[in-house]
Amino acid sequence: MKKSLLKTSLREIRSSFGRFIAILAIVALGVGFFAGLMVSEEAMLKTGETYLDEQNFYDFRLMSTLGFDDDDVAALRDADEVTAADGAYQVDALVSDGGDEEKVGRFHSITEDVNKLALKDGRLPENAGECVVDSSFFEGAGIGDTVTIADGNSQDTLDALENHELKIVGVVESPLYMRMGRYSSEIGSGEVEAIYFVPADAFTSEYYTEMYLSVNTSGGLYSDEYDDCIDDTEPDVTKVAEGSVNARYQEIVDEINDGRKEAQEGIDKANDALELAEKAGAPDSQLEEIRAQRDEAQEVLDDLTIPEAPELYVLTRDEDVGFQFFKSDSAIVSSIAKVFPVFFFLVAALVCVTTMTRMMNEQRTQIGVLKSMGYSNASILMKYMTYSGSSGIIGCLLGYFLGTWGFPTIIWSAYRTYYALPDQVLYVFNWQLLLISLAVTLLCTIGVTWICGRSALTQSAAELIRPKAPKAGKRNLLERVTPVWKRLSFLQKITVRNLFRYKARFFMMILGIGGCTALIVTALALQDNFMGVSDLQYNEIDLYDANASFNESLSQEDMDAFLDANGERVAGALFTYTGNMDISANGTTHSVSMNAPIDNGDLGDFFSWHADGTEYSLPEDGELLLDRGLADRLGVQTGDEVTVRDSDMHETTLKICGVYDNYISNNAYISRGTLENAFGKTDVNSAFINFKGDGDVHEQAAALMNADDNITNVTIASDNQSMFTDMLDSLNIIVIVVILCAGALAFIVLYNLTNINISERIREIATLKVLGFYSNEANAYVFRENTALTVFGALAGLVLGKFFHAFVMAQIVVDGLSFDAYVTPQNYAIAFVLTIVFAFITQLIMRRKISRIHMAESLKSVE
């Protein structure tokens, strides 16, 4: 008996393959979209983590004003938890690689254990006269070409490298330049245009400019566990590094003191000899010789000055631009994945309801016969559950594996444009995600079939064998509007009645098409929201051209001297204190870049702090101006109080005087009085700068750094804008994927509904053909109500899209990034038009099914 039902089920699949595929397709689409987007972040992070582990990307980067020697490296290598340590050289130089113009090249020494190079083409250097070039900056030259260090470099730069002509022997990728972007330099144009790696013996210096460390860590990329390991290890690394550097500094001081002592002894001896010679009446030539010896010793003494105590900088991966951007990119993908698939599963359930209800109504007689033959309700129900369940399971598995492979691959291909990472993303199999997908699929297919089948099987076999009585006709709302109803044609009246005749199909169509439109509205609006962030931040809020960081705090005299010395290129400067602090409220703590500018009356030339038409100025003492994104994450608003703590553990409570619009990074502003009274600081370590004229900002920034040794770095605002624009540009691929999936959703819904309508009205359509209706008229009989429902659904989708977009934006929470949630009229118009286009394409495909209806066969009696 079970074999017979199984055969019947298989025959049913073959005879109604279109319906079977419709359920399979909508499930595959929903699962693929859900699993594919959900696993994309994990796949991206796994690929990035594997690459960084293979290249042994540093955990700590150490820099010192004194440099490092081999003993320093050995001391760190022997420290607890340190697994590898490499000293490294770096120098920027003007180079020529065969082009017409010189460009800024950055030379790195090749390290053995940390930051390993990934060879893409050619080979690695074998001697000091060879180099490899980073693939991200490989333009204008080729393997075999020669890179020449230009004579126009400073003498220190020329002396830094052993050879001034280097042969390019390979192309590499380095984890140091994971993200392709702009890097500033103190020379030339101010922008690094080529990056080269050479053997360590190509450098002449005895001291390394930096040191890279790898330490024992646990946890994945960007995980809290990894961050905890770094936080626990950093004090020990800093202690060992400071001890080693200070010990060498003391050796240098001792050597200088010994030299000074020796020079002083020489001076004293010369003075004694001169005194004796003068008393003895020695000739002038002898006296001059003694004086020359004394002056020489004095010059040596004057030259032997004790250097300032060294400063040590311990940096982590978090300070690496590419590392941070990769984190933000993957987080945005994950946020979007949490929302979109809901529609697909909901529509899948409605498609299954419509399909299985229609199938069981068509097979009432067959069900009645099976009951009369002794088949139990459970056995009969199992036949239909097998039909929907097999379709759902196949669709789920197909969608899962295609989605978890396809979506990460497509998204990765877009991000690969901006990152020096492996060409292929690693495949991630997530059992938990697959089980969730299967559970939801079975609920939407077998669960729905069980609910639909129970009501049908409550009737007796005799009732089921007889045809079901047609539903009693109901007047719709339009029929009650007599003036309008009378003016409709016969076919138009049929269309109106059919629109509201089947409630499940009506809601499936409205939800499916409305969901399609809402998805497109959301995708297009997301694109606009993302793309507008950089322009809003750097054109309407941050108005400065560059930000200069100083090694030592500036006095008022230093600030005046800076402006006087750079008067030709600097139009204005806003001097400030800038430092990272922790801000807490409602049990939540975030890191913030705290700024305390000196208000010299031209604050508006550098910043425009505003929100909802309100302009904000510098806070009063005891107050804080906070950016909107951080305020939202802390759950605070104007008038609330927050706790702020600096790196020296000074803690104070400040009142929020305003919350201003800000989109990139976490920023807050306080007065100089608050800085001094609450944190005991009077530092001026940074300046926001506006340049004169329309000259190249990179050249002007390089000139600033060349002219002032106290400037450690100049950040160009336009470079930051370009980097964020590039980062958000890569999200366009997600917008395209969402639109394509929305089109597929519309097609499946329309195909399924049209297929059912044609099957139900096959005798009506055949009758129309016999009566002489043209093909277009017969097609319109079916498609007219589809078109009406498509328009209704699209209009509903426009409204739904507004709320859907707001919900999606609320889910996108990335630290240091905020977005304005808005939908433009163009978004609505494009979404509506695309939905109608998708519906029209579906109708073109379904015309063939109507044209194949055989009039004579279709008009035969169903009895």
What are the residue ranges of the model-derived segments?
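Short cytosolic juxtamembrane segments of multi-pass membrane proteins
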Residues: 3, 457-476, 848-863
